[in-house]
Amino acid sequence: MKKLFGLLVCLFLLSSCDDGDLVVESFNFDDVSIQKCPDKDPLFKINGQELLLLDIPSSFFPNEITPDGQPRIATVSSENRIIYRKYDAKLNDNSVICSTVPPATPLVQQEWNAVEGGTIEITTTQNTITDPDTGEVTITGYNHRIKFINVEFVNGQTSFAYEDYFFGDYITAP
């Protein structure tokens, strides 16, 4: 009887083992700068084998200051997409995103897409320098602070969400 019970316990443990698939419940791109391809709209961050991509028209980044408390708002949709990808190898450069024909490797292991309805907030300020001798102020660029509000990512039946996620600062020339 003890042997039968032991066999049943072993079978149960073997059948309940994890299959090894990676389950993403969050990501961290805090220490990574935003990048952009020279001739394409998407903004993205690369962190090792991970990619976080914001595909939004450049018209959301005019060189105009947003009033205090009134950021530009874009709703996550088929035109304003946020995508998280996990690759099978480290991304050494931006060729995965910027190439007309993407390289054969690395391969996407998982892709999580933000569902429609979340919010992308963009607050724009001027970057300036002041000449110490003349006091003349020169605009050196515009800083676009990007936040995701109530954004949910899905992959099949699994999802995770961010109530408030700071994507980063994207700087444009004056």
Predicted feature locations:
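Bacterial Sec-dependent N-terminal signal peptides
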Residues: 11-39, 174
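A general structural signal for short secondary-structure junctions and capping/turn motifs
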Residues: 2, 35-36, 136-137
